[in-house]
A protein has these predicted regions:
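Contiguous, structured surface segment used for ligand recognition
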Residues: 1-49
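Extracytoplasmic
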Residues: 565-755
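Short, surface-exposed beta-strand/loop "edge" segments at domain boundaries and coil↔beta transitions
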Residues: 15-19, 62-65, 470-473, 724-730
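Catalytic-core regions of glycoside hydrolase
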Residues: 29-33, 57-59, 66-70, 77, ...
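Generic recognition of long tandem-repeat/solenoid scaffolds
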Residues: 7-11, 37, 136, 455-461, ...
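C-terminal non-catalytic alpha-helical accessory regions
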Residues: 367-376, 384-579
Length: 755
């Protein structure tokens, strides 16, 4: 700014001028209706990465669960420009209004095409063996099917404007597991080469890349060999997205992993495979990312839902490259918020960015809505200037969107939000002081924003909704825990005073819980804020419509009391003892709580059950205690879940109690899920055959252990899958595995001395 108050903003091209405007807007502040600029404003900058992009649109979750209105065309365009002003230069789009708008600002476009994605119903003989059995995908080894896909490609790109980039995705969904296609990676890349010829016939300047999503090691190696065989000038880049990483077990799941790369883990699992890909690629091909930073759980870089299952070769993450699997969503908040809820993860995504991006030419991130606003905005700023520190990019975001005065409070709130939504061992949700701190920070920031900004600020209202809803959930969980504690104390006293029936009746009358005044206030605040943010910009937090849950398993507690009321005195005492001292196996006994990060010291075979798909509430009854709905399992292995005990009393007799439950499956998975039963062995002696696991709501199963099995002081308990489970051809078994199939399954085990 010179003495004549003239501001000069210049760019080397049309987009450069747009970025200059973005820099100007980030530098100014508004005070009392007046624009203020720094005293000295001299900025000369250029982007660090060639490709900087994302996707724009509203999610089905927002429309169906959060009940938001549709965006207008102008609002869609505003979101595009928000990210472009932050530094984006390319957006994923189809043809039509969005394409035309992008081109009007000199922005680049990315088109997409599924190499084996059908455009409608196809003959059954053409159907691919997709990894989880989805239909509508073509087997490219069927000549007529391949010709059909080539014609689809020609029809789509002929007589239409050119995209700057075209992405061919490899899987999720798509691909084919059949023997004729193996290795599918080679079948796929040869088909993509033919499709690239078609595109270049009409649009010779379009750059082509593919993604290896859900490919296995053989697929990737076949593509490496194909690219190394001779120059493939038609291909610009290898695309890397969810399911591409051969050194992580995050969704979407790969079936095999490059265990050899873990010998020296370097900076950790995120960077191992990009480095290997770059090593294998010929120099004319680039590595381009398609990072998934839109889901807060069960996704490429998100909180894990459960500990990952073993891959097709039985491999699990090595313990020295393991930290990403220790990030779990808060076990209560995850019951309320959809995968596509409003959130921010500054620390985690900053780490991911810095682990991955040194190996690529840029990123066109995956976004499934507008709930990931901070993540996407931060990513674009880092693609422009990757040496920016985390505090710098967070502070810049808060100044840009909330104003200079409110920024410090909002920056603290962003860090707290990420911490609050993560499970913290030993600190359950009611003890998380950050919930109230976050709410207070965002509330205090509101009045510090310029009035004209605050009146129209949908984004602050989204952060405030999150605070009110999290506080409501915290209070609800605390209320339920207090009820459980009250009942446990009452039953404990009754057992000592021999008045159990009276205590049961009293306790059963306490289960109807109502919102406290503070809970009601939080819910009402979230409702009002949600209506305002929806009116202002078609955004609202889905959690408001999903607040009522049995968070801690009160359903089990109520059922146990009802059973005790109907039982005979001795059985009643046993049932009530579990109410007051649930895990206690008695003197000389052992308890194992199987599942993700639970103490199960006697397990020697099996691993935590991850459900094979995003967990939804319908899969298990919320009436289960947390320990009852978390399990170990095996897949198609011949050895089922196994526990081994040593140093037992050879003169004692033992019995064993299991908690069993089996999940519900979504319609697209259910037809191949025939597993219901399992058998139980003590050493090599069958003690229970074809035990049917209860559906959704767990129950207990108790058996005597033959004295012979414990006479040497050792005992092996082994589960065995039913004879008709995981049988059949290779493809059907793989689809079953990939969809969450289980052979044996168990939640808890008590080994107890008989009295």
């Amino acid at each position: 700014v010179d003495h004549q108050n003239i501001l000069l903003a210049a760019g080397v091209d049309q987009r450069g001028c747009l970025y200059a405007v973005g820099e100007f807007l980030r530098q100014i502040s508004v005070r009392n209706g007046v624009l203020e600029l720094p005293g000295q404003l001299e900025v000369r900058t250029a982007p660090a990465f060639e490709i900087r992009g994302t996707q724009v649109g509203q999610s089905d979750v927002a429309k169906n669960l959060a009940k938001v209105r549709d965006w207008t065309d102008k609002e869609t365009q505003r979101v595009i420009l928000d990210y472009a002003l932050a530094g984006a230069n390319i957006f994923s789009t189809g043809y039509g209004k969005k394409y035309d708008f992008l081109k009007s600002f000199g922005l680049m476009t990315q088109g997409e095409f599924g190499a084996n994605t059908a455009a409608g119903k196809i003959p059954e003989a053409w159907e691919a063996k997709e990894s989880i059995g989805r239909t509508g995908y073509v087997c490219l080894s069927v000549p007529e099917g391949k010709d059909y896909m080539l014609k689809l490609c020609d029809d789509y790109f002929r007589d239409r404007p050119a995209f700057d980039l075209v992405k061919f995705w490899g899987g999720d969904g798509g691909g084919c597991e059949c023997d004729k296609c193996k290795p599918y990676g080679l079948t796929f890349i040869k088909t993509v080469e033919k499709m690239a010829e078609i595109i270049h016939k009409y649009h010779p300047e379009t750059k082509i890349y593919f993604t290896n999503q859900k490919f296995d090691n053989a697929d990737d190696n076949a593509i490496f060999s194909y690219l190394q065989e001779k120059p493939r000038d038609w291909l610009w880049a290898w695309g890397y997205g969810p399911g591409s990483d051969a050194t992580s077990w995050q969704p979407g799941h790969r079936q095999t992993h490059r265990m050899d790369l873990f010998n020296y883990p370097g900076y950790g699992p995120y960077s191992l495979y990009p480095k290997e890909i770059l090593h294998q690629l010929p120099p004319q091909q680039k590595l381009l990312y398609y990072n998934e930073i839109t889901h807060w759980k069960y996704a490429q870089h998100a909180f894990i839902q459960m500990y990952p299952r073993a891959d097709r070769e039985g491999n699990l993450p090595p313990h020295w490259s393991h930290d990403i699997y220790e990030r779990r969503p808060d076990q209560f908040l995850t019951m309320v918020y959809n995968r596509l809820t409003f959130y921010a993860c500054p620390r985690n995504y900053f780490r991911v960015f810095n682990d991955l991006m040194p190996y690529g030419v840029g990123d066109i991130t995956h976004s499934s809505g507008h709930h990931d606003h901070f993540n996407q905005w931060m990513w674009q700023r880092l693609l422009w200037a990757p040496r920016t520190t985390l505090d710098e990019v967070v502070n810049e975001y808060c100044r840009t969107w909330f104003g200079k005065e409110a920024a410090p409070l909002m920056a603290k709130a962003l860090y707290l939000l990420e911490k609050n939504i993560e499970e913290q061992p030993g600190i359950p949700l009611p003890q998380k002081t950050g919930i109230s701190e976050y709410y207070d920070l965002v509330r205090r920031a509101g009045p510090l924003m310029p009035k004209q900004t605050m009146d129209q600020d949908w984004l602050w209202r989204m952060y405030m909704q999150k605070g009110a809803l999290d506080r409501y959930v915290q209070l609800s969980v605390e209320q339920q825990m207090q009820l459980q504690s009250r009942i446990e104390k009452r039953i404990s006293t009754a057992l000592k005073n021999d008045e159990s029936l009276k205590a049961i009746e009293e306790s059963l009358g306490w289960f109807e819980l109502k919102d406290t005044p503070e809970m009601a206030a939080m819910k009402e605040e979230a409702r009002v804020l949600g209506e305002e943010s929806n009116r202002l910009f078609g955004d609202r937090n889905d959690g408001y419509f999903n607040l009522q849950h049995d968070f801690i398993g009160l359903g089990w507690l109520k059922r146990q009391l009802e059973r005790a009321r109907s039982a005979r005195p001795r059985e009643r005492r046993e049932l009530l003892n579990m109410v007051v001292d649930y895990e206690n196996p008695g003197e000389g006994g052992f308890y194992d709580n199987l599942g993700t990060y639970n103490p199960a010291p006697h397990v020697v075979a099996g691993y935590p059950y991850d459900h094979g798909q995003p967990y939804v509430s319908e899969m298990m009854s919320e009436g289960n205690r947390a320990s009852q709905r978390s399990m170990h399992f095996t897949q198609n292995e011949e050895q089922g879940v196994t526990l081994h005990y040593t140093d037992l009393d050879p003169k004692a007799t033992y019995q064993i109690r299991f908690t069993f439950v089996r999940p519900w499956y979504q319609d697209r998975y259910a037809p191949r899920m025939n597993q219901k039963c399992q058998s139980i062995y003590a050493d090599d002696q069958l003690i229970a055959k074809n035990v049917e696991l209860p559906f959704k709501m767990s129950d207990f199963f108790t058996y005597d252990i033959p004295a012979k099995a414990t006479s040497d002081g050792d005992l092996t308990i082994r589960l065995e899958k039913a004879g008709d489970v995981a049988r059949g051809d290779r493809v059907s078994v793989e689809q079953w595995r990939n969809s969450g199939g289980w052979g044996t399954l168990v939640s808890e085990v008590w080994l107890m001395k008989k009295k």
